[in-house]
Amino acid sequence: MATTADFKNGLVLKNEGKLQQIIEFQHVKPGKGPAFVRTKLKDVVTGKTIDKTWNAGVKVETATVDRRDVTYLYNDGTSFIVMDDKTFEQYELSPDAFGDAGRFLLENMRVQVSFHEGEALFGELPVSVDLRVEHTDPGLQGDRSTGGTKPATLETGAEIQVPLFIETGNVLKVDTRDGSYLSRVNN
């Protein structure tokens, strides 16, 4: 059990018979009336998000979630397949288990997966990953209509905006949280 004071991003709650993860929360203390907490919750099974308001100090049941390092193996078209690094057991995760960051997954990449009662729920990539540019148009020195960026397709198929000096074959450090270019990696 936890109270609303214990809320933090990533905490998994048992709410209305479902496992829901806190994506965002905000403590609000209005001038009149009692304090409350606004939350955005994501159902870990279906991926749907809902907004819920809690009275401050309310006790909430939390789920015991075990985070493990796993290796991403492949995408079979309907799910992501990962393998536990210690037991070598394989698990299936739904296509939205990694959220938008799933587009940066490479085979044999080390990721973290959260488990509840032996079932894989959702995964997290490292904050940044190094990926090779598969294709990008040459950047013209005088082209500033796009603010000094151009689209580039990475080896995973994801497309991001990169500076004009980036060329096909460069290895880039990419932020998996928002898909932004961080830096060019020296080869």
Swiss-Prot record:
Pfam families: EFP, EFP_N, Elong-fact-P_C. It comes from Corynebacterium glutamicum (strain ATCC 13032 / DSM 20300 / JCM 1318 / BCRC 11384 / CCUG 27702 / LMG 3730 / NBRC 12168 / NCIMB 10025 / NRRL B-2784 / 534). The gene is efp. InterPro entries: Elong-fact-P_C, NA-bd_OB-fold, Rib_uL2_dom2, Transl_elong_fac_P/YeiP, Transl_elong_KOW-like, Transl_elong_P/YeiP_cen, Transl_elong_P/YeiP_CS, Transl_elongation_fac_P. Its main location: cytoplasm. Pathway: Protein biosynthesis; polypeptide chain elongation. Keywords: Cytoplasm, Elongation factor, Protein biosynthesis. Belongs to the elongation factor P family. SMART domains: EFP, Elong-fact-P_C. One of its GO terms (cellular component) is cytoplasm. The keyword Protein biosynthesis applies. The keyword Glycoprotein does not apply. This is Elongation factor P. It is found in: Cytoplasm. GO terms for biological process: peptide biosynthetic process. One of its GO terms (molecular function) is translation elongation factor activity. Involved in peptide bond synthesis. Stimulates efficient translation and peptide-bond synthesis on native or reconstituted 70S ribosomes in vitro. Probably functions indirectly by altering the affinity of the ribosome for aminoacyl-tRNA, thus increasing their reactivity as acceptors for peptidyl transferase.
